[in-house]
Amino acid sequence: MKLKELMQAIPVYTGEASAAIEVNQIAQDSRKVQPGTLFICIDGEIVDGHQFADRAVQLGAVAIIAEKQLDVSVPVLYVRDSKRAMAMLADYFYGSPTQALKLVGITGTNGKTTVSHLVEQIVRENGEQTGLIGTMYRKIGDEILETKNTTPDSLTLQETFRDMLLSGVSTAVMEVSSHALVQGRVYGSDYDVAVFMNLSQDHLDYHHTMEEYAYAKSLLFAQLGNSYNLSNPKIAVLNADDKESVRMQTATAAHIITFGIKEPADFSASNIQITSHGSTFDLKTPVGDFALKIKMIGNFSVYNVLAAIATSFALRIPVINAIATVESIPGVKGRFELVNAGQDFPVIVDYSHTPDSLLNVLQTIDEFAEKRVFVVVGCGGDRDKGKRPQMAKIAVDYATNPIFTSDNPRSEDPHAIIEDMIQGVPGSDSYVVHENRRDAIRYAVNMAEAGDVILIAGKGHEDYQVIGDEVIDFDDRVEARIAIEKKLGLA
């Protein structure tokens, strides 16, 4: 594509976009530059891409997008916001793929991964080819691709959408993080349905206040647009029980569909019964009432199912079809996932890494636990420190046997992170500390007896642990299974 044509995606810039320059690819990482690359300088939190402009030129960059003045031998086109420019250029370069896809964006503190998987499965079982982008991976049809962030950078995102189209995908479902919204990674993406799950404390190391965090989430709904095309209306699916839904509704001109348990909603649940094997409830919808029996456990699972069914309805999938799918799904990896190696007590691995999600899971366990509740819990390093004492207090308040341990300490001292947690439980003697996560899991398993429940919280599906600069193999589910088998004399 000619540079002059590509720059049509940016309404205002300074510099000369030559019609003679051919652009073969776009990159923001100088290590990926090849001859014919348009290099975009991003001034990031850790690295400033402007410092690598010379290197990009040496590797074959034919032009550069920048915010700061550069002295290089190729044309430089200056923009006000490189991140926004990159997203718009990526969309244009890859042929505006989301205009040809049905695109669902799901945001919120908790539930994004489960709901995205539920919706993707519902759409797939309705006969459509699907794509999925989220915390665990990117998925194009049946092909699984690794991902580094919940929401990839805009170049990767638009390339993925393009590849989805080429593979015959008609509907893409994606998790949209608050970081991605603030950083402009999803600019240029044409959403058909946007879903708001909930808002509770997380990422305040980045957003600083809950007000900023809520504003970040609302950006998805502002981006949803105001198309009133009856054949393809824009729809916002909102949690009626979360007060921040008012903000999301105010931010969009799209049609509104609501779900909830406490407040009146278009899709609501009542007569909820929770057991150690699943949940049952009565579902009220705009097209009738239904009795549901799902294999997922807890009120939070009911919310997730309500959101998935409401979203499917927004996609014009019959409610009865959506119900059939959600009733058949056992759950999502690392989300209230049971580890069974022959022991006589439940061991649950869950991604709950926020105060609200940990509280929800422990309250659910309390509904069926016969005796003691062990919780293995830590907090991530280089992340929101404010939630550490809250996580510890919830563990002490709702579990009989809290075990404080490491999560992904990253560059922080694991001991210091645990000390931050302990600040939330002054005077308590109910917890123990095992800094090594493997030791903490083995301690819980060795202590547990019939009728007890173990929750291993925080990492869920993750199969690694980040300690300093090292990424080591570590999977809570594998470690729990090994510990159980050793206890039972099977290993």
Curated annotation (Swiss-Prot):
- E.C. no: 6.3.2.13
Q: Give, as one word, the top-level EC class.
A: ligase
Keyword annotations from UniProtKB, A to Z: ATP-binding, Cell cycle, Cell division, Cell shape, Cell wall biogenesis/degradation, Cytoplasm, Ligase, Magnesium, Nucleotide-binding, Peptidoglycan synthesis
> What is the protein's major site of localization?
cytoplasm
What Gene Ontology cellular-component terms does the record carry? cytoplasm
Q: Which cofactor does it need?
A: Mg(2+)
Residues that coordinate or bind ATP: G108, T109, N110, G111, K112, T113, T114
Q: Name one GO biological process term.
A: cell wall organization
**Sites of N6-carboxylysine modification:** K217
Keyword Ligase assigned to the entry: answer is yes
SUPFAM superfamilies membership: MurD-like peptide ligases, catalytic domain, MurD-like peptide ligases, peptide-binding domain, MurE/MurF N-terminal domain
What chemistry does it catalyse, as a reaction equation? Answer: UDP-N-acetyl-alpha-D-muramoyl-L-alanyl-D-glutamate + meso-2,6-diaminopimelate + ATP = UDP-N-acetyl-alpha-D-muramoyl-L-alanyl-gamma-D-glutamyl-meso-2,6-diaminopimelate + ADP + phosphate + H(+)
| Keyword Ligase attached | yes
* Residue window of motif Meso-diaminopimelate recognition motif: 407-410
Pathway this chain belongs to: Cell wall biogenesis; peptidoglycan biosynthesis
Transmembrane parts of this sequence: none
Q: Post-translational modification, briefly?
A: Carboxylation is probably crucial for Mg(2+) binding and, consequently, for the gamma-phosphate positioning of ATP.
Functional description taken from the UniProt entry:
Catalyzes the addition of meso-diaminopimelic acid to the nucleotide precursor UDP-N-acetylmuramoyl-L-alanyl-D-glutamate (UMAG) in the biosynthesis of bacterial cell-wall peptidoglycan.
Q: Which family does it belong to?
A: Belongs to the MurCDEF family. MurE subfamily.
Q: What is this protein called?
A: UDP-N-acetylmuramoyl-L-alanyl-D-glutamate--2,6-diaminopimelate ligase
Source organism per entry reads: Listeria innocua serovar 6a (strain ATCC BAA-680 / CLIP 11262)
What gene name does this entry carry? murE
